[in-house]
Amino acid sequence: MIQERLNEIARSVFDDDSLVLTSSSKAADVPGWDSLAHINFMFSVETEFGVQFSDDEFVGFEDIGDLTSMLARKLQT
């Protein structure tokens, strides 16, 4: 469920309907994922899931799997 929603957000932010993020996907794997796109993606994630990330969390995940785990923890609290 989280992964599907992240894919929907990524497709919108990166304007690529064929984009599929996996748990091992990193920013470097996605064409156009630069610092500005990262900010747009993360703000969109915060809005979609109704969560807020700390500064460290905002930039501290290695791959989509890390982001998914972080979101799951936030949604449980």
Predicted regions and their residues:
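Phosphopantetheine-dependent thiolation modules in NRPS/PKS and related acyl-activating systems
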Residues: 1-32, 37-77
